[in-house]
Protein backbone atom coordinates (compact mmCIF):
# COMPACT_ATOMS: atom_id res chain seq x y z
CA UNK A 1 0.00 0.00 0.00
CA UNK A 2 1.52 3.36 -1.00
CA UNK A 3 2.09 6.04 1.61
CA UNK A 4 -0.60 8.61 2.24
CA UNK A 5 -0.48 11.43 -0.26
CA UNK A 6 -0.62 14.94 1.09
CA UNK A 7 -0.45 18.22 -0.79
CA UNK A 8 1.36 20.97 1.11
CA UNK A 9 -0.66 24.13 0.59
CA UNK A 10 -0.02 27.60 1.93
CA UNK A 11 -1.87 30.90 1.54
CA UNK A 12 -0.79 32.68 -1.65
CA UNK A 13 -2.63 36.00 -2.04
CA UNK A 14 -3.24 37.28 -5.57
CA UNK A 15 -0.91 39.85 -7.09
CA UNK A 16 -3.82 41.73 -8.66
CA UNK A 17 -7.17 42.88 -7.38
CA UNK A 18 -9.71 40.06 -7.54
CA UNK A 19 -12.97 40.85 -9.34
CA UNK A 20 -15.53 40.59 -6.55
CA UNK A 21 -19.08 39.38 -7.01
CA UNK A 22 -21.02 41.58 -4.58
CA UNK A 23 -20.96 45.23 -3.62
CA UNK A 24 -22.84 47.36 -1.11
CA UNK A 25 -24.50 50.59 -2.20
CA UNK A 26 -24.65 53.03 0.73
CA UNK A 27 -27.39 55.68 0.51
CA UNK A 28 -25.81 58.13 2.96
CA UNK A 29 -28.27 60.98 2.49
CA UNK A 30 -30.48 59.67 5.30
CA UNK A 31 -27.73 58.22 7.48
CA UNK A 32 -28.21 58.74 11.24
CA UNK A 33 -24.48 58.27 11.97
CA UNK A 34 -25.15 55.60 14.60
CA UNK A 35 -22.22 55.22 16.99
CA UNK A 36 -22.57 51.44 16.69
CA UNK A 37 -22.82 51.40 12.89
CA UNK A 38 -23.31 47.90 11.49
CA UNK A 39 -20.32 48.45 9.21
CA UNK A 40 -18.04 48.11 12.21
CA UNK A 41 -19.32 44.59 12.81
CA UNK A 42 -18.48 43.27 9.34
CA UNK A 43 -17.07 39.77 9.82
CA UNK A 44 -14.71 40.28 6.88
CA UNK A 45 -13.53 43.79 7.89
CA UNK A 46 -14.52 45.15 4.48
CA UNK A 47 -15.24 48.61 5.89
CA UNK A 48 -11.98 49.02 7.84
CA UNK A 49 -10.24 52.30 7.05
CA UNK A 50 -13.13 53.20 4.78
CA UNK A 51 -12.51 56.92 4.98
CA UNK A 52 -8.85 56.66 4.01
CA UNK A 53 -9.55 54.37 1.08
CA UNK A 54 -12.30 56.51 -0.37
CA UNK A 55 -9.97 59.49 -0.63
CA UNK A 56 -8.20 57.89 -3.60
CA UNK A 57 -10.30 57.49 -6.72
CA UNK A 58 -8.05 54.86 -8.34
CA UNK A 59 -9.34 51.82 -6.47
CA UNK A 60 -12.81 53.07 -5.58
CA UNK A 61 -14.63 50.60 -7.84
CA UNK A 62 -12.48 47.73 -6.56
CA UNK A 63 -13.37 48.72 -3.03
CA UNK A 64 -17.08 48.63 -3.81
CA UNK A 65 -16.91 44.95 -4.72
CA UNK A 66 -14.93 43.53 -1.81
CA UNK A 67 -18.19 42.46 -0.14
CA UNK A 68 -18.42 38.74 0.68
CA UNK A 69 -22.21 38.66 0.47
CA UNK A 70 -23.09 37.72 4.05
CA UNK A 71 -25.83 40.45 4.12
CA UNK A 72 -25.17 41.15 7.82
CA UNK A 73 -24.89 44.92 7.33
CA UNK A 74 -27.81 45.08 4.88
CA UNK A 75 -30.17 43.34 7.28
CA UNK A 76 -28.97 45.10 10.44
CA UNK A 77 -28.94 48.74 9.28
CA UNK A 78 -31.67 50.49 11.28
CA UNK A 79 -32.42 52.90 8.44
CA UNK A 80 -32.26 50.33 5.64
CA UNK A 81 -29.72 52.38 3.71
CA UNK A 82 -27.49 49.54 2.52
CA UNK A 83 -28.27 47.58 -0.64
CA UNK A 84 -26.39 44.64 -2.09
CA UNK A 85 -25.60 44.70 -5.81
CA UNK A 86 -23.87 42.29 -8.19
CA UNK A 87 -20.71 43.51 -9.87
CA UNK A 88 -21.37 43.83 -13.65
CA UNK A 89 -17.69 43.13 -14.34
CA UNK A 90 -18.05 39.85 -12.44
CA UNK A 91 -21.09 38.86 -14.48
CA UNK A 92 -19.11 39.48 -17.68
CA UNK A 93 -16.44 36.92 -16.76
CA UNK A 94 -16.14 33.69 -18.77
CA UNK A 95 -19.05 32.12 -20.63
CA UNK A 96 -21.83 29.58 -20.20
CA UNK A 97 -19.39 26.76 -19.36
CA UNK A 98 -16.63 28.63 -17.56
CA UNK A 99 -19.06 30.62 -15.46
CA UNK A 100 -18.14 33.56 -13.21
CA UNK A 101 -18.76 31.43 -10.13
CA UNK A 102 -16.41 28.70 -11.39
CA UNK A 103 -13.70 31.28 -12.14
CA UNK A 104 -14.12 32.92 -8.73
CA UNK A 105 -14.09 29.54 -6.97
CA UNK A 106 -10.88 28.56 -8.76
CA UNK A 107 -9.23 31.82 -7.71
CA UNK A 108 -10.19 31.13 -4.10
CA UNK A 109 -8.82 27.59 -4.15
CA UNK A 110 -5.56 28.71 -5.75
CA UNK A 111 -5.18 31.38 -3.07
CA UNK A 112 -6.03 29.30 0.00
CA UNK A 113 -5.75 25.63 -0.96
CA UNK A 114 -9.06 25.12 0.84
CA UNK A 115 -12.39 23.66 -0.19
CA UNK A 116 -14.82 26.42 -1.22
CA UNK A 117 -17.97 26.68 0.87
CA UNK A 118 -20.84 28.43 -0.89
CA UNK A 119 -23.38 28.60 1.92
CA UNK A 120 -25.53 26.75 4.42
CA UNK A 121 -27.75 25.14 1.79
CA UNK A 122 -28.35 24.67 -1.91
CA UNK A 123 -31.72 25.51 -3.41
CA UNK A 124 -31.03 24.44 -6.99
CA UNK A 125 -31.04 24.03 -9.87
CA UNK A 126 -30.42 20.31 -9.47
CA UNK A 127 -29.85 19.51 -13.13
CA UNK A 128 -28.10 21.14 -16.03
CA UNK A 129 -26.14 20.30 -19.16
CA UNK A 130 -22.92 18.32 -19.25
CA UNK A 131 -21.45 17.42 -15.88
CA UNK A 132 -24.46 18.87 -14.08
CA UNK A 133 -26.61 16.07 -15.54
CA UNK A 134 -24.72 13.61 -13.30
CA UNK A 135 -25.39 13.30 -9.57
CA UNK A 136 -22.91 11.37 -7.47
CA UNK A 137 -24.57 8.75 -5.29
CA UNK A 138 -23.41 9.01 -1.69
CA UNK A 139 -24.10 5.38 -0.84
CA UNK A 140 -23.63 5.45 2.93
CA UNK A 141 -26.19 2.69 3.44
CA UNK A 142 -24.57 0.34 0.93
CA UNK A 143 -21.14 0.76 2.44
CA UNK A 144 -19.91 2.73 5.46
CA UNK A 145 -18.35 6.08 4.70
CA UNK A 146 -14.61 6.57 4.93
CA UNK A 147 -12.92 9.62 6.39
CA UNK A 148 -9.77 9.91 4.34
CA UNK A 149 -9.56 13.69 4.17
CA UNK A 150 -8.68 13.96 7.88
CA UNK A 151 -6.28 11.03 7.80
CA UNK A 152 -8.14 8.58 10.02
CA UNK A 153 -8.73 6.18 7.14
CA UNK A 154 -6.76 5.46 4.00
CA UNK A 155 -8.08 6.49 0.59
CA UNK A 156 -5.73 6.09 -2.35
CA UNK A 157 -5.81 8.43 -5.34
CA UNK A 158 -2.86 6.80 -7.10
CA UNK A 159 -3.19 5.63 -10.70
CA UNK A 160 -0.82 3.93 -13.10
CA UNK A 161 -0.52 5.13 -16.68
CA UNK A 162 0.55 2.50 -19.19
CA UNK A 163 -0.36 -0.84 -20.66
CA UNK A 164 -1.36 -3.66 -18.32
CA UNK A 165 -1.09 -7.38 -19.02
CA UNK A 166 -4.44 -9.15 -19.17
CA UNK A 167 -2.71 -12.30 -17.92
CA UNK A 168 0.71 -13.21 -16.55
CA UNK A 169 2.55 -15.76 -18.72
CA UNK A 170 4.92 -17.76 -16.49
CA UNK A 171 7.94 -19.93 -17.09
CA UNK A 172 8.13 -23.43 -15.55
CA UNK A 173 10.16 -21.99 -12.67
CA UNK A 174 7.44 -19.43 -11.90
CA UNK A 175 9.21 -16.38 -13.31
CA UNK A 176 7.54 -14.02 -15.78
CA UNK A 177 7.84 -15.21 -19.36
CA UNK A 178 7.87 -11.61 -20.63
CA UNK A 179 8.76 -8.30 -18.96
CA UNK A 180 5.99 -6.25 -17.43
CA UNK A 181 5.16 -3.16 -19.51
CA UNK A 182 6.52 0.18 -18.25
CA UNK A 183 4.18 2.40 -16.29
CA UNK A 184 4.17 5.91 -14.87
CA UNK A 185 2.69 6.15 -11.37
CA UNK A 186 1.06 9.41 -10.30
CA UNK A 187 -0.39 9.98 -6.80
CA UNK A 188 -3.37 12.01 -8.02
CA UNK A 189 -5.47 11.28 -11.14
CA UNK A 190 -4.77 14.67 -12.72
CA UNK A 191 -2.31 15.47 -15.51
CA UNK A 192 -1.40 18.93 -16.77
CA UNK A 193 -2.26 19.50 -20.42
CA UNK A 194 -1.29 22.15 -22.95
CA UNK A 195 -3.38 25.29 -23.18
CA UNK A 196 -6.30 24.98 -25.63
CA UNK A 197 -6.00 28.31 -27.47
CA UNK A 198 -2.44 29.56 -27.25
CA UNK A 199 1.04 28.66 -26.11
CA UNK A 200 1.81 30.31 -22.76
CA UNK A 201 5.02 32.15 -22.00
CA UNK A 202 8.21 30.36 -21.00
CA UNK A 203 7.73 31.41 -17.38
CA UNK A 204 4.21 29.99 -17.22
CA UNK A 205 5.32 26.73 -18.84
CA UNK A 206 8.22 26.38 -16.40
CA UNK A 207 5.89 27.00 -13.46
CA UNK A 208 3.44 24.34 -14.68
CA UNK A 209 6.27 21.83 -15.10
CA UNK A 210 7.68 22.50 -11.63
CA UNK A 211 4.23 22.38 -10.04
CA UNK A 212 3.65 18.99 -11.65
CA UNK A 213 6.99 17.81 -10.27
CA UNK A 214 6.14 19.08 -6.78
CA UNK A 215 2.79 17.26 -6.89
CA UNK A 216 4.27 14.05 -8.30
CA UNK A 217 2.18 14.19 -11.46
CA UNK A 218 3.13 14.84 -15.10
CA UNK A 219 2.85 17.82 -17.41
CA UNK A 220 2.24 16.54 -20.93
CA UNK A 221 4.37 19.34 -22.37
CA UNK A 222 7.42 18.28 -20.32
CA UNK A 223 9.83 16.22 -22.43
CA UNK A 224 11.73 15.10 -19.32
CA UNK A 225 9.00 12.65 -18.34
CA UNK A 226 8.83 8.98 -19.35
CA UNK A 227 5.26 9.69 -20.48
CA UNK A 228 5.28 11.05 -24.03
CA UNK A 229 2.31 12.09 -26.14
CA UNK A 230 1.84 12.10 -29.92
CA UNK A 231 -1.11 13.57 -31.83
CA UNK A 232 -3.04 10.98 -33.80
CA UNK A 233 -1.89 10.56 -37.40
CA UNK A 234 -1.69 7.74 -39.97
CA UNK A 235 1.93 6.97 -39.02
CA UNK A 236 1.66 7.55 -35.28
CA UNK A 237 2.14 3.85 -34.46
CA UNK A 238 5.39 3.84 -36.41
CA UNK A 239 6.60 6.89 -34.50
CA UNK A 240 5.66 5.27 -31.19
CA UNK A 241 7.54 2.07 -32.01
CA UNK A 242 10.64 4.01 -33.02
CA UNK A 243 10.59 5.97 -29.77
CA UNK A 244 10.02 2.86 -27.64
CA UNK A 245 12.83 1.00 -29.37
CA UNK A 246 15.19 3.80 -28.35
CA UNK A 247 13.73 4.00 -24.83
CA UNK A 248 12.03 0.77 -23.65
CA UNK A 249 10.85 2.48 -20.45
CA UNK A 250 8.82 5.03 -22.39
CA UNK A 251 5.03 5.09 -21.93
CA UNK A 252 3.47 6.14 -25.23
CA UNK A 253 0.17 8.02 -25.32
CA UNK A 254 -1.73 9.10 -28.42
CA UNK A 255 -3.88 12.23 -28.36
CA UNK A 256 -7.20 11.34 -29.97
CA UNK A 257 -9.94 13.97 -30.49
CA UNK A 258 -13.33 12.67 -29.43
CA UNK A 259 -15.76 12.30 -32.31
CA UNK A 260 -17.76 9.81 -34.37
CA UNK A 261 -14.68 7.77 -35.33
CA UNK A 262 -12.84 7.92 -32.00
CA UNK A 263 -14.07 4.56 -30.67
CA UNK A 264 -12.93 2.56 -33.70
CA UNK A 265 -9.63 4.42 -33.81
CA UNK A 266 -8.97 3.93 -30.08
CA UNK A 267 -9.58 0.18 -30.36
CA UNK A 268 -7.26 0.03 -33.37
CA UNK A 269 -4.47 1.94 -31.61
CA UNK A 270 -4.75 -0.29 -28.55
CA UNK A 271 -4.43 -3.45 -30.62
CA UNK A 272 -1.33 -1.98 -32.27
CA UNK A 273 0.43 -1.53 -28.94
CA UNK A 274 -0.26 2.04 -27.81
CA UNK A 275 0.00 2.27 -24.01
CA UNK A 276 -2.49 5.06 -23.34
CA UNK A 277 -5.21 6.96 -25.17
CA UNK A 278 -5.76 10.66 -24.47
CA UNK A 279 -9.39 11.23 -25.43
CA UNK A 280 -9.73 14.99 -25.68
CA UNK A 281 -12.74 17.23 -26.16
CA UNK A 282 -12.61 20.97 -26.75
CA UNK A 283 -12.18 23.36 -23.84
CA UNK A 284 -15.96 23.48 -23.38
CA UNK A 285 -16.12 19.70 -23.03
CA UNK A 286 -17.65 18.90 -26.42
CA UNK A 287 -16.56 16.33 -28.99
CA UNK A 288 -16.34 17.21 -32.68
CA UNK A 289 -19.95 16.07 -33.16
CA UNK A 290 -21.24 18.03 -30.16
CA UNK A 291 -21.41 15.08 -27.76
CA UNK A 292 -20.40 15.98 -24.22
CA UNK A 293 -17.22 14.45 -22.89
CA UNK A 294 -19.08 12.43 -20.25
CA UNK A 295 -21.16 10.57 -22.83
CA UNK A 296 -18.23 10.18 -25.23
CA UNK A 297 -15.93 8.76 -22.55
CA UNK A 298 -18.65 6.45 -21.27
CA UNK A 299 -19.21 5.07 -24.78
CA UNK A 300 -15.46 4.64 -25.31
CA UNK A 301 -15.04 2.85 -21.99
CA UNK A 302 -17.96 0.53 -22.76
CA UNK A 303 -16.48 -0.32 -26.16
CA UNK A 304 -13.25 -1.44 -24.49
CA UNK A 305 -15.21 -3.47 -21.94
CA UNK A 306 -17.17 -5.25 -24.67
CA UNK A 307 -13.94 -5.95 -26.56
CA UNK A 308 -12.49 -7.44 -23.36
CA UNK A 309 -9.34 -5.34 -23.25
CA UNK A 310 -10.28 -2.40 -21.04
CA UNK A 311 -7.48 -3.11 -18.57
CA UNK A 312 -4.92 -3.26 -21.37
CA UNK A 313 -4.88 0.49 -21.94
CA UNK A 314 -5.02 3.67 -19.88
CA UNK A 315 -7.73 6.13 -20.84
CA UNK A 316 -7.00 9.80 -20.11
CA UNK A 317 -9.82 12.30 -20.69
CA UNK A 318 -9.65 16.08 -21.03
CA UNK A 319 -11.80 19.02 -22.06
CA UNK A 320 -14.19 21.19 -20.08
CA UNK A 321 -13.05 19.87 -16.69
CA UNK A 322 -13.35 22.93 -14.47
CA UNK A 323 -14.21 21.63 -10.99
CA UNK A 324 -12.99 18.89 -8.67
CA UNK A 325 -16.33 17.11 -8.99
CA UNK A 326 -15.77 16.86 -12.74
CA UNK A 327 -12.69 14.72 -12.06
CA UNK A 328 -14.74 12.18 -10.11
CA UNK A 329 -17.59 12.23 -12.64
CA UNK A 330 -15.21 11.69 -15.57
CA UNK A 331 -13.61 8.74 -13.79
CA UNK A 332 -17.06 7.32 -13.05
CA UNK A 333 -17.80 7.52 -16.79
CA UNK A 334 -14.78 5.33 -17.49
CA UNK A 335 -11.57 7.37 -17.58
CA UNK A 336 -8.55 6.30 -15.55
CA UNK A 337 -7.51 9.91 -14.99
CA UNK A 338 -8.01 13.38 -16.44
CA UNK A 339 -5.90 16.16 -17.90
CA UNK A 340 -6.64 19.82 -17.15
CA UNK A 341 -5.59 23.01 -18.90
CA UNK A 342 -7.74 26.12 -18.34
CA UNK A 343 -7.90 25.68 -14.52
CA UNK A 344 -4.11 26.02 -14.45
CA UNK A 345 -4.38 29.43 -16.10
CA UNK A 346 -7.19 30.45 -13.76
CA UNK A 347 -4.98 29.53 -10.82
CA UNK A 348 -2.53 32.14 -12.12
CA UNK A 349 -5.28 34.80 -12.04
CA UNK A 350 -6.28 34.47 -15.71
CA UNK A 351 -9.64 36.13 -16.42
CA UNK A 352 -10.41 34.31 -19.68
CA UNK A 353 -10.49 37.64 -21.47
CA UNK A 354 -8.46 36.16 -24.37
CA UNK A 355 -6.56 39.39 -24.89
CA UNK A 356 -3.53 37.23 -25.60
CA UNK A 357 -5.19 35.94 -28.77
CA UNK A 358 -5.56 39.47 -30.12
CA UNK A 359 -2.12 40.66 -29.10
CA UNK A 360 -3.52 42.89 -26.34
CA UNK A 361 -1.67 43.20 -23.05
CA UNK A 362 -2.70 40.70 -20.37
CA UNK A 363 -4.51 42.49 -17.50
CA UNK A 364 -2.62 40.39 -14.93
CA UNK A 365 0.76 40.35 -16.70
CA UNK A 366 0.94 36.58 -16.86
CA UNK A 367 3.95 36.52 -19.20
CA UNK A 368 6.14 37.95 -16.42
CA UNK A 369 4.66 35.96 -13.54
CA UNK A 370 6.79 35.16 -10.49
CA UNK A 371 7.90 31.53 -10.62
CA UNK A 372 7.52 30.50 -6.97
CA UNK A 373 4.21 32.31 -6.71
CA UNK A 374 2.84 30.53 -9.79
CA UNK A 375 4.01 27.10 -8.63
CA UNK A 376 2.38 27.49 -5.22
CA UNK A 377 -0.92 28.72 -6.69
CA UNK A 378 -1.15 25.61 -8.88
CA UNK A 379 -0.19 23.36 -5.96
CA UNK A 380 -2.90 25.00 -3.84
CA UNK A 381 -5.52 24.37 -6.53
CA UNK A 382 -4.68 20.68 -6.84
CA UNK A 383 -4.57 20.41 -3.05
CA UNK A 384 -8.13 21.72 -2.83
CA UNK A 385 -9.25 19.42 -5.65
CA UNK A 386 -7.57 16.44 -3.99
CA UNK A 387 -9.39 17.12 -0.71
CA UNK A 388 -12.73 17.31 -2.53
CA UNK A 389 -11.99 14.08 -4.38
CA UNK A 390 -11.30 12.39 -1.04
CA UNK A 391 -14.58 13.74 0.32
CA UNK A 392 -16.58 12.38 -2.60
CA UNK A 393 -14.90 8.98 -2.52
CA UNK A 394 -15.29 8.78 1.24
CA UNK A 395 -19.01 9.47 1.01
CA UNK A 396 -19.29 6.73 -1.62
CA UNK A 397 -17.40 4.29 0.59
CA UNK A 398 -14.68 3.79 -2.02
CA UNK A 399 -11.12 3.46 -0.82
CA UNK A 400 -9.17 3.95 -4.07
CA UNK A 401 -9.79 5.94 -7.21
CA UNK A 402 -9.00 2.96 -9.45
CA UNK A 403 -12.17 1.28 -8.19
CA UNK A 404 -14.16 4.37 -9.15
CA UNK A 405 -13.36 3.91 -12.84
CA UNK A 406 -16.52 3.03 -14.75
CA UNK A 407 -18.47 2.61 -11.49
CA UNK A 408 -21.68 4.10 -12.88
CA UNK A 409 -23.59 2.56 -9.98
CA UNK A 410 -22.11 5.32 -7.83
CA UNK A 411 -23.80 8.00 -9.92
CA UNK A 412 -27.28 8.95 -11.04
CA UNK A 413 -27.70 10.18 -14.60
CA UNK A 414 -30.57 12.59 -15.06
CA UNK A 415 -31.58 11.11 -18.40
CA UNK A 416 -32.00 7.71 -16.72
CA UNK A 417 -33.94 9.19 -13.81
CA UNK A 418 -36.21 11.11 -16.15
CA UNK A 419 -36.88 8.08 -18.34
CA UNK A 420 -37.36 5.50 -15.60
CA UNK A 421 -38.79 7.52 -12.70
CA UNK A 422 -40.27 10.87 -13.69
CA UNK A 423 -41.31 10.09 -17.26
CA UNK A 424 -43.93 7.43 -16.47
CA UNK A 425 -45.52 9.76 -13.89
CA UNK A 426 -45.29 13.22 -15.47
CA UNK A 427 -44.87 12.38 -19.14
CA UNK A 428 -42.28 13.74 -21.56
CA UNK A 429 -40.54 16.93 -20.50
CA UNK A 430 -41.53 19.86 -22.72
CA UNK A 431 -38.67 22.24 -21.90
Regions found by a protein language model. Name each.
Residues 1-38, 43-190, 194-210, 217-218, ...:
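Conserved, well-structured core domains of diverse proteins
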Residues 19-23, 28, 33-35, 39-44, ...:
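Glycine-rich phosphate/ribose-binding loops and adjacent secondary-structure elements
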Residues 37, 72, 203, 207, ...:
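Generic recognition of stable, solvent-exposed alpha-helical segments in well-folded globular domains
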Residues 194-196, 222-224, 239-242, 255-258:
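Structural motif
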Residues 209, 240, 244, 266-267, ...:
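Generic structural signal for well-ordered alpha-helices
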Residues 226-236, 243-249, 269-273:
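Acidic (Asp/Glu)-rich catalytic clusters
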Residues 346-412:
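Active-site or pore-adjacent capping/gating segments
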